[in-house]
Amino acid sequence: MEDGTFADALGAGIDLQPHTLNSGTEAIEALFSGAIDAAFVGPNPAINGFAQSGGEALRIVAGTTSGGAALVVRDGIDAPDDLIGTTLATPALGNTQDVALRSWLAGQGIDATTEGGGDVSVRPQENADTLTAFVDGAIDGAWVPEPWATRLVLEGGGHVLVDEATLWEGGRFVTTQLVVAASYLEDHPALVRALIAGLLDSIDTVNADPAAAQAAVNDGIEAITGKRLADATLAGAWAKLTFTPDPVPGSLEGSKEHAVAIDLLEPVDLSAIYDLTLLNQELSDRGQPPGGGARGPAGGRGAANPPRPQPVIRPGRRPSACGSRARRAG
């Protein structure tokens, strides 16, 4: 956004209005209300928004990041059984990492209720509060996204008990994707394709010069929070993520199944959540093949293979969702 890539892709006469929001849930609410037209959100907010609207409100049109989440714990916890009686944090009840933790605990035969009871007490809270609580010894660990996982290790003295990448086929699982309002996609397909083109251009920029991309990310973090990440934190987190237009649809279905299994989501059919037609058209024009296993509305193959995956970080204390509105000026 800040370097003008998206504005250039949209072209003259289009008023791009970016918004930073506090969470994926807030972004979906803004999408519902018409306050924004598109947003970068995690998988579970997209699933929840799709389910709440009866499959009518939104479509996933591209992936953005894959990977980058872990369960980091204090010394003395080296196996699942060591977690009995501990307190673990997640970013929010029902969010992507919260579902991942509760699902993994259930798979280990460890009970954790949504009220904070059970064998392990799960405490949903802001990531910044989690870091402070971990350093102070008020919690025993947390399942969090990057760069918070790396910060818990480097600043909190923790170690990784579970790297979420080890739980997914090929180590690939969606962490951020581009969603648009279904009505906006229907009414303005050319503008949505331009947004996708801007995303692909951004991916190319990151892939071509990761060092410059890291510096740009840190500049953005400093502009929002007033403080830069340490170079070691940024590098450690960067190595855990992949910036890719592939929405990794199999992992979205897996996240849904996990949420249903632990009673955080009613069963929902996600077969219509993807519309990757415009992404595939843009990739084709760039000489890149489609792929990834999702299906478009007409039954065509969806998703997209990354043009050479490179790691990317999600900003530090930056809000966890970003929305935008694109309108013709005048």
Regions found by a protein language model. Name each.
Residues F40-S53, L101-W104, D140-H159, W168, ...:
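A ligand-binding cleft/hinge motif common to bilobed small-molecule-binding domains
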Residues E257-P311:
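Conserved C-terminal helix/tail region of periplasmic/extracytoplasmic solute-binding proteins
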Residues E186-E266:
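Secondary-structure end/capping motifs
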Residues G4-G13, T166-G171, A239-V248:
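Short, solvent-exposed loop/beta-turn-alpha elements that line the ligand-binding surface or hinge
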Residues D119, D129-I221:
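Pocket-lining segment of extracytoplasmic ligand-binding domains
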Residues M1-P124, D140-W143:
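Short, glycine-/small- and polar/acidic-enriched structural segments
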Residues A298-G330:
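Compositionally biased, low-complexity flexible segments
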Residues D3, I28, F32, P43-A46, ...:
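Extracytoplasmic/secreted envelope proteins and their assembly/folding machinery
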